[in-house]
């Protein structure tokens, strides 16, 4: 897939999944704008890939509107938006989760995604073309002890469908990717601190492994590309088979690899 001549904006683009998307789009010819709350990190990545950096807190609607206007004025109309900005949540019992914790997750993961999609997507719709890929999560598809994060990501999936319907005849496609347990720096830190058990995460997936940021980026690029020109409003899980494997635990778990059977 070539993205030569395309302008791509990545929110939360300086680390994790966002950084993988930024690098991969740049490698395939796109002019990439790395936006992030951490401007220094965004500038370092932009310098590495030959892109542009911009400070952006997606939780503020006006900041997204200003970023969309500034990028268009400096570089031209945006062709691709990837909304990867997000914050995580520790698994806590509902009564231990503070109102401030919930508000921050909702502000960034749900409202922030909405702010960016509308700020850039409305301009795409007026121009008659564009592709948006939102980053949701399998946490928005199943019950988990993530009482703020899971509902916020479920909302991202549904807003993706709503925007796809509204902008479809204006030439704008909107799709979601739902990552499974992805070996980002944040998850790697949690594993190193003993907060997550990598064996449990791997064994819960049909493929027996975790997902990489590059796995997610490949799916994002496909949905953003012309190869997906007839695809809009979908949610694509990229989870190494976690969703399909969960119910097998009630039947004794997944079978071993065929090569290990007698």
Language-model-derived ranges and their functions:
Residues 137:
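Residue(s) in the substrate-gating loop at a strand-loop-helix junction
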Residues 92-94, 98-106, 201:
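Substrate-binding pocket helix/loop in short-chain dehydrogenase/reductase
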Residues 117, 152, 160:
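Active-site helix of classical SDR
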Residues 122, 165-169, 229:
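Alpha-helical segment proximal to the catalytic Tyr-Lys
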Residues 97, 142-151, 162, 190:
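Active-site loop-to-helix junction immediately N-terminal to the catalytic Tyr of the SDR YXXXK motif
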């Amino acid at each position: 897939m070539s993205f030569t001549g395309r302008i791509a904006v990545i929110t939360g683009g300086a680390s994790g999944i966002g950084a993988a998307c930024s690098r991969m789009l740049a490698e395939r010819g796109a002019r990439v704008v790395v936006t992030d709350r951490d401007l220094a990190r965004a500038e370092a990545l932009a310098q590495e890939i030959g892109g542009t950096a911009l400070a952006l807190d997606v939780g503020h609607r006006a900041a997204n509107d200003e970023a969309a206007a500034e990028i268009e004025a400096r570089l031209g109309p945006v062709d691709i938006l990837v909304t990867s900005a997000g914050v995580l949540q520790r698994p806590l019992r509902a009564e231990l989760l503070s109102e401030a914790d919930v508000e921050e997750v909702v502000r960034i993961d749900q409202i922030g995604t909405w702010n960016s999609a509308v700020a850039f997507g409305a301009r795409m719709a007026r121009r008659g073309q564009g592709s948006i890929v939102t980053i949701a999560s399998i946490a928005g598809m199943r019950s988990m002890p993530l009482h703020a994060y899971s509902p916020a990501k479920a909302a991202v999936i549904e807003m993706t469908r709503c925007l796809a319907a509204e902008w479809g005849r204006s030439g704008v496609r909107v799709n979601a990717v739902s990552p499974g347990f992805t070996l980002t720096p944040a998850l790697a830190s949690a594993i190193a601190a003993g907060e997550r058990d990598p064996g449990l995460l791997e064994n819960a997936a049909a493929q027996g492994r975790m997902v990489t940021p590059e796995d997610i980026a490949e799916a994002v690029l496909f949905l953003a590309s012309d190869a997906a020109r007839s695809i809009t409003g979908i949610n694509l899980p990229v989870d190494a088979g976690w969703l399909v494997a969960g119910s097998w635990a009630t039947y004794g778990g997944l079978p071993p690899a065929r090569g290990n059977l007698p």
